[in-house]
From Swiss-Prot:
Signal peptide limits: none
One Pfam family hit: Cytochrom_C_asm
GO BP: cytochrome complex assembly
Record membrane topology: Multi-pass membrane protein
Protein task: Required during biogenesis of c-type cytochromes (cytochrome c6 and cytochrome f) at the step of heme attachment.
Protein name stated in the entry: Cytochrome c biogenesis protein CcsA
GO terms under cellular component: chloroplast thylakoid membrane; plasma membrane
Quaternary context: May interact with Ccs1.
Organism this protein belongs to: Saccharum officinarum
Gene name tied to this protein: ccsA
InterPro entries membership: Cyt_c_assembly, Cyt_c_biogenesis_CcsA, Cyt_c_biogenesis_CcsA/CcmC
Location in or out of the cell: Plastid, Chloroplast thylakoid membrane
TM spans (from-to): 9-29, 44-64, 68-88, 143-163, 225-245, 259-273, 288-308
Keywords: Chloroplast, Cytochrome c-type biogenesis, Membrane, Plastid, Thylakoid, Transmembrane, Transmembrane helix
Amino acid sequence: MLFATLEHILTHISFSTISIVITIHLITLLVRELRGLRDSSEKGMIATFFSITGFLVSRWVSSGHFPLSNLYESLIFLSWTLYILHTIPKIQNSKNDLSTITTPSTILTQGFATSGLLTEMHQSTILVPALQSQWLMMHVSMMLLSYATLLCGSLLSAALLIIRFRNSFDFFSLKKNVLRKTFFFSEIEYLYAKRSALKNTSFPVFPNYYKYQLTERLDSWSYRVISLGFTLLTVGILCGAVWANEAWGSYWNWDPKETWAFITWTIFAIYLHSRTNPNWKGTNSALVASIGFLIIWICYFGINLLGIGLHSYGSFTLPSK
């Protein structure tokens, strides 16, 4: 009872905090001068991280196993992973382009886990025999880490496509449209303002130079993040194959989850291969990564909706009483 109460408090603290953070984040996109608010949003992300970490530790202690046995726990772990990705640029002392991706992703994941699932699905369950293995932590954590990383990389690629083609659609060309102030559009305005200030200098500045700088940075970040995610996905699939051989006597069974994991791996392998061709860099490779975004959600959620196959214990079915 004590652990259940603690988990309830921590999940709602983390969700409330991240909701405030995303509000502050949107305000700072609209008003760049409010630097104090930007610092507050970072402190809020730290508070969210510790709340989610506290929940995972509490669930681990109370259940006696790593908290990755059902959809609810995996979503909480996914939001925790997104925060880890949020901190990587800060560790490297580089511009945090990922924050515009990771912050909304964290609140959506946390919000769905907290409010979108039935309360009965929040309960910790006894592991089925197939999950009573040390491979649980290695395989499932690697898969969720890869999902979070690949989703962020795919969204960066989608941002690149939106920025490059926004002038092709009247929806994006409206000067007062709110979308200009979200995602990376505020960065574009800053770069264009900077370009205007340099008009009277002797340096050559062509019209789309700063927009080009931004898209190149997005392309670079997307490639680096997806490369990391692809590595994690490969490790996760290999761990799952070894575990499957121990549990079911076969490395690969073409279970629906396994099939879509293979499709996901193939899509991002194509993305990485396309990067070796200069003609496919940028827009074309970003298109492949954007397709991968949809494939990941099919692999993670779509198969769970069906509730069939060897991975049915991760479905939306309610725990047995």
